[in-house]
Amino acid sequence: TYKLEEKNEKNGYRAVFEMTVKDGKITESKYDNINADGKSKTEDTKYEESMKAKSGVGPKEYIKQLNDSFVKAQSASGVEVVTGATHSSESFQNYAQQLIQAAQAGNTDTIEIDNGATLKDGTYSLKEKNDSNGYHTTFSMTVKDGKVTESNYDNVNADGKSKKDDTEYESKMKDVAGVGPKEYIETLNKEFVKAMGEEDGSPAGVEVVTGATHSTHSFINYAQQLVNAAEKGDTTEIVVDNIVTK
């Protein structure tokens, strides 16, 4: 059983998350938001009503949906984003990914997220271990004076060449989606630095790039993980053993 918890409450709640692995499979996902008394947000009828009125869904529904989706998908990236609860879904995916990484390493220490802490200066980096369609993600983020000053997200092949320079891929994707890696990779890096410069800035503030929705969600997921590392000041490179299904 692998556990993760946020240390700090936001709007009266913090996330707690427990994942059980049996015979190499995720058999149970218990993600929740609890208050200081340990009461679940799913039981907060007032919150449920006001959120439902605004976005058509409340914690009672989306928390269960996310847990079910995770067990079904057996991966963080496969979790369906719940309409009306995009931010919660992205946060869930980030934490699910961190639990999977802990499980791959067999590390059952509770992961503590110092959410909202001032970012510590340094360079934080993450990379995927496996190529998918010939490319894997590399991502580094620089923090100076508590602010994100630089974002270097890229997709590179085995020779370290960027997807941005793959003219064939660029023209193919542009035809289909109206945008290619040359554009969206740069846009995501720029948007991230901008989003983090806002008051209470977070990766969730990154706008989805039309035509590159999947890449945007993956970017936000990894950006959140780098921000969590910076909140703690942990500059160890994060290696994501992204499971590439054949």
Task: Give the positions of each predicted feature.
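Active-site- and interface-proximal helix/loop "cap" or "latch" segments in soluble metabolic
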Residues: 5-119, 127-246
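A short tyrosine-centered beta-strand micro-motif
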Residues: 1-2, 124
